[in-house]
Regions:
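C-terminal alpha-helical "lid/dimerization" subdomain adjacent to the S-adenosyl-L-methionine
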Residues: 16, 156-211, 215, 221
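N-terminal auxiliary segments of SAM/dcSAM-dependent transferases
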Residues: 1-19
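A short acidic, Gly/Pro-enriched loop at the edge of an enzyme's catalytic core
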Residues: 112-123
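Conserved alpha-helix/loop element of class I SAM-dependent methyltransferases that forms part
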Residues: 27-30, 36-57
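Class I SAM-dependent methyltransferase SAM/SAH-binding core
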Residues: 58-113
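Hydrophobic beta-strand segment of the Class I
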Residues: 28, 124-125
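A short glycine-rich, Lys/Arg-flanked "PGG" loop and its adjoining helix->strand segment in the class I
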Residues: 137-152
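Core SAM-dependent methyltransferase catalytic element
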Residues: 209, 216-239
Length: 239
């Protein structure tokens, strides 16, 4: 089945994404560096700085992967839960956490059906998460549900540039680079071609901002990163 067809429905995308991230988990940290032009850690630190974590803040990091954002929030004094749908990602995050005291607590969970109580967090973060869910509105609803009134959400993700020329060049670059890395690391050129395919179906930064507003957030803003190839969204749950 062609990649485009495999992710054409919510059910198909959910199955494909779960299988994909289980496959790439052990190389996830490496691939995020390679596909972000070496800027991944800088972008995540920028998101963390915008979140203004503090002692006693309750935070949840969604699509936590191996825990980069979660660990940074915890270092600033926040009480952090890291959630990821991929069991292997959580195993890797927990392996890192064993060397720390007072670090995040990690658990397996789905962004569209979080195993967390409502109105229980001051902050929700997501790195490369919203673009991968099978139902974006459901994920935004879950973020809204678990936040306290007045709580903040931040999301870092790939963006679909508004310029048709830049968009075409960007997607072509990701497609070729993804194919090469997929073959070198997994002997499967389609492994990282999922990224440009998912961007084509993503509403883009402005579209995500409109969805956040429609689902009950205010003070919605987004910051273009790297000429708009990436974006960081910030929004507040209405008081």
């Amino acid at each position: 089945m062609a990649l485009r067809d495999a992710i054409a429905t919510p059910e198909g995308k959910q199955t494909y994404v779960r299988r994909l991230f289980a496959t790439i988990a052990d190389r996830y940290d490496l691939i995020t560096v390679l596909l972000s032009y070496g800027q991944d850690r800088r972008w995540k630190q920028r998101l963390v700085a915008m979140a203004s974590p503090r002692q006693g803040m309750r935070a949840v990091d969604l699509a936590t992967g191996t825990g980069d954002i979660a660990f940074s929030l915890a270092e600033a004094g926040a009480s952090v839960v890291g959630v990821d749908v991929t069991h292997r990602m959580i195993e890797l995050a927990n392996a890192k956490a064993r060397h720390l005291s007072g670090g995040p607590f990690f658990l397996v969970g789905d962004m569209i059906a979080l195993p967390l109580a409502g109105d229980s967090f001051d902050l929700v973060t997501a790195g490369y998460g919203l673009r991968n869910v099978p139902d974006l509105r459901a994920a935004i609803d879950e973020i809204h549900r678990v936040l306290h009134a007045g709580g903040t959400m931040l999301s870092l993700d790939f963006n679909r540039p508004e310029s048709p020329i830049l968009r075409a060049v960007y997607l072509a670059y990701l497609n070729v680079t993804g194919a090469v890395l997929g073959w070198l690391l997994h002997r499967d050129p389609d492994t990282y071609r999922y990224i440009p395919a998912s961007i084509r179906n993503y509403p883009g930064a402005a579209g995500v901002a409109r969805m956040l507003e429609a689902q009950g957030f205010d003070r919605v803003e987004y910051t273009p990163v790297l000429l708009g190839l990436m974006a960081i969204h910030i929004a507040r749950k209405k008081s």
